[in-house]
Amino acid sequence: MAAVPPENGVDGDDEREEEEEDEEEEEEEEEEENGDEAEEEPRLKYQRMGGNVPALLSNDAASCIAVAARMIALGTHDGTVRILDLLGNQVKEFRAHTAPVNDINFDTEGEYIGSCSDDGSVVINSLFTDDEKMKFDYHRPMKAISLDPDYTKKQSKRFVAGGLAGHLYMNSKKWFGNKDQVLHSGEGPIHSVKWRGSLIAWANDVGVKVYDTAKDQRVTFIEKPRGSPRPEALLPHLVWQDDTLLVIGWGTSVKIASIKSDQQQTGTFRQIQMSSLTQVDIVASFQTSYYISGIAPFGDSLVILAYIPIEGDGEKEFSSTTTLSRQGNAQRPEIRIVSWNNDELTMDALPVHGFEHYKAKDYSLAHAPFPGSSYAGGQWAAGDEPLYYIVSPKDVVIAKPRDAEDHINWLLQHGFHEKALAAVEASEGRTELIDKVGAGYLDHLIVERKYAEAASLCPKLLRGSASAWERWVFHFAQLRQLPVLVPYMPTDNPRLKDTVYEVALVALATNPSYHKELLSAVKSWPRSVYSALTVISAIEPQLNTSSMTDALKEALAELYVIDGQYQKAFSLYADLLKPEVFDFIEKYSLHEAIRGKVVQLMLLDCKRATVLFIQNRDLIPPSEVVPQLLKAGKNPQVLKAGKKCDSRYYLYLYLHALFEVSHDTGKDFHDMQVELYAEYDTKMLLPFLRSSQHYKLEKAYELCVKKDFLREQVFVLGRMGNAKQALAVIINKLGDIEEAVEFVSMQHDDDLWEELIKQCLNKPEMVGLLLEHTVGNLDPLYIVNMVPNGLEIPRLRDRLVKIVTDYRTETSLRHGCNDILKTDIVNLLVKCFNEARRGVCLSHEDDDSRAKREDNNRSSFSQRMVVDKSLSIKMTEVKSKTRGDTRCCMCFDPVSIRGDTVVVFFCCHAYHETCLMDAAFSNNNHKTTKGSSGYEYSYDNGVDEEEEDEEEDEDGDGDRPGRSRLRCILCTTAAAASAR
């Protein structure tokens, strides 16, 4: 049964707030009033007991109730005790009495039940043994009964009971039957009795007393609250919260008594437990504005069944003992949860059937706090929640603490979706409940138009459900709020359909405010989750429009990369001036694509761009680079970027780098380069003027004059042929006589020397410098003779001494050089002569066969007879000459290498080998004839004589007998004749 909102509010809180209104400021009062209007969450939930209860109470009326661990006992006005299960189904009944049942009580084990009635009887029934029943008649109406908690375990089978007679009986089983012991009497009827452990508490007209069965004596007395209604009209209520805390609700008063005792154990052979009361404290006491029809513990608070008196009726409410009120204007009973300080935590009005006609005593409250129940942090352990039974004549209402799911549902009903979500997460509820709360929370945020907050919660609420994600993506899209959801969309676990991601990206692209989010999504999302071409098609129409932001342009470039359109991507990256564009060019070999992005690349990194242009000058010639740089200031991308563009400086860097690589590639721009060097790098101007042949001299000269570049003027004038004017600049403006001398020396013009001397004669210092630097170029005496008489030349003596010294040094060096030259000439002539004396043996054998033959004969000597390439060439020339009419210089017969071996010398004289050998033999007195040849002959085939002699000495062959060198007979004879 759903809780019914209170009709009268919380009276206690209203009183406290009214007392504080005079002490607080107006703003605080308004906040408190607003707080009062907010509905508090109930602590309990209610439902009517079903089963057989409605049918039973339709013909009878309930009078009392008792609760055990596994069952419920309901007493009725017809004297029947009905045993019900926890769902209200009747399992057993005892027709124990003939009058209304006033009280029922179970033992702790729930095996026995005791009841008392106005017929004066007390009946004890066993719940599991049909024939075990005991009935005791006291002849006066009995109002209260309580079984020994250990009734099942103990043989004494004790119980206490009392009624209108005013006697409190303790009945126990003895050897000869049951016996009653009067524990107390003489203070009016016994209205209530409760037994816990060894303590028995009862209430009479005077107050509440406590009896200790272990010590067999009364231990305390608590006086009846003053002004309480008569007990016959409003019964006192006693509840043991635990073994030491007794809760008393009487009229409008609540007291909580703490009963403490010291236990000592003494004895020698056995232990005897002794109990001595030390203290009874009233730990809590307060008054209520309502009558107490029942009370029970609720964790560290109290549950009170409140009866709201009719205003102005006062004691009239209790003037009649009849059950039904003729007026029929009674208010609903209320369940209130209060702290021990009477701080009201919650209040629920109960829609009990026929409440308009009931009095306070017509209601009762029973609870089932069993041992083992735990209460911590406002929550009971699962299955240990206490149950509360509110009994009226025609109704039994069950109240129990609300669980986490009830709490969550209440929060959802009242719009506290965020708190509901937190509660679900804390309780780790069912998946269905989590989905329900999440969907409700998102719907609530959407209704409140808190789209960003709703989007941020989607990962937590939708978790791994792909269908839920897709549903909410399209829902956000319908609301045109999809851009706020995109940053939270999952790309893995779960992965959504490709269409979902494409719709999201297109939604971002159409709104300039979310272009940055689009860029972030394109960079972070895996390429495989969507089709880049679809998104590209949606973005491309925005190119060159006002909605095309830099972020959208970069996102489009990223999409081009994903789709493999690298040139388009490069174009956008270059326009965006992205530093990584250079690496992008190298990675994808986009050198041809840089043709139209010269300015952008120079703006990014002029040095790196210059290197790139130079390396690819075949693809991007200077004729394309220079015009773009000249128009850099008008480039729309440069203007949009707002960057400073020094186009002339970029031109200087490019043309300078180009000139260093190739002097002629950029020749069309050398005139411009002269201006750029003059502006940015004056040190390079003169080397450039000297190296280049493609600039206009007149224009260069005008620039040098304008900038006052003197040495550059000298060079340009010299190249223009104005040597005298250039010399004048050197002397008159530079004053550098050494440079003037160098300049004149390079011109190779004697008239220019005269001009130099003429311009220096009027300047004594210049004359002195001229004397110092003309040694080796001009005769110093000539200069001295031209000096006018009387001209004072500074440091003339020292300079003359230096001139003479330098002249002597120069003369000595020249003599030494001449001697060296003569020696070199003689040596070279000797070498030439030796070369001319060498002979070459020609025969029909090829060179390789001959070399092999000679190697076999003279292995050591053959290593020195290697014919190099130059010798082979010479031999070829000789062979060509001997193929004509050449004759032997000895026998004058024609020579031919086909039949005979021929020896040819470099003097072009040829001999038959036999003729030459005979002549050599006849001239050698130490050698024998050829027929008895024990000698060997060698030829001057390209080996220097002196070197060969040295080698022979080193090898030990110089003393070998029978070895002689063949020489040209004619040349040798001629040389001998000339020597004579």
From Swiss-Prot:
Write out the ranges of the repeats annotated as CHCR: 613-769
Provide ranges: composition bias, Acidic residues: 10-40, 942-957
Q: Name one GO cellular component term.
A: HOPS complex
> CDD domains of this UniProt entry?
RING-H2_Vps8
The stretches annotated as WD repeats are: 57-95, 96-135, 185-221
- Gene Ontology annotations of biological process type: endosomal vesicle fusion; gravitropism; protein targeting to vacuole
Which keywords accompany this UniProt record?
A: Protein transport, Repeat, Transport, WD repeat
Write out the ranges of the annotated region (Disordered).
1-42, 931-964
Top-rank taxon of the source lineage equals Eukaryota
Q: What does this protein do?
A: Required for vacuolar assembly and vacuolar traffic.
Q: Which family does it belong to?
A: Belongs to the VPS41 family.
Q: How does it assemble?
A: Component of the homotypic fusion and vacuole protein sorting (HOPS) complex composed of the class C Vps core proteins VPS11, VCL1, VPS18 and VPS33, which in HOPS further associates with VPS39 and VPS41.
Q: Per its record, how is this protein called by name?
A: Vacuolar protein sorting-associated protein 41 homolog
| Native organism | Arabidopsis thaliana (Mouse-ear cress)
Gene symbol?
VPS41
